[in-house]
Amino acid sequence: DFNSPLTVEKDDWGLAFVNVLKTSAESASLYNLWYELPQEKRYSHTYGKKRSALDHIVIAKTLSDGKGIEYKKGTFTPFIVPYMLESDGVPKRWQISDKGKGKHLGEGFSDHLPLTAIFHTISE
């Protein structure tokens, strides 16, 4: 959870993730797995009506060289299950009591969707 958007838009705060680590679809050494998904699927967080990719899995390109540990291409995705979403598709946030010290009410999840990817070993 870097809390850094994938790209900078007019009203974004701070630097975009691609600027911080110099990642891109063409990067020589690092690859952000968001680039595997179409633009409209690149989100793990929703604030209001704005969807953004604040969470990232960045891999070294050596994880796709056919040696040792390997990223299984095409397996990256936000983990989305219905019980983790509100009826409008927004992640169901933790429910915190507004009384006292903000006690968790035992309902809801993070406001960020988890990211998943499959890695495996290559037998030599």
Language-model features: where?
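Metal-dependent phosphoester-hydrolase catalytic domains
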Residues: 3-124
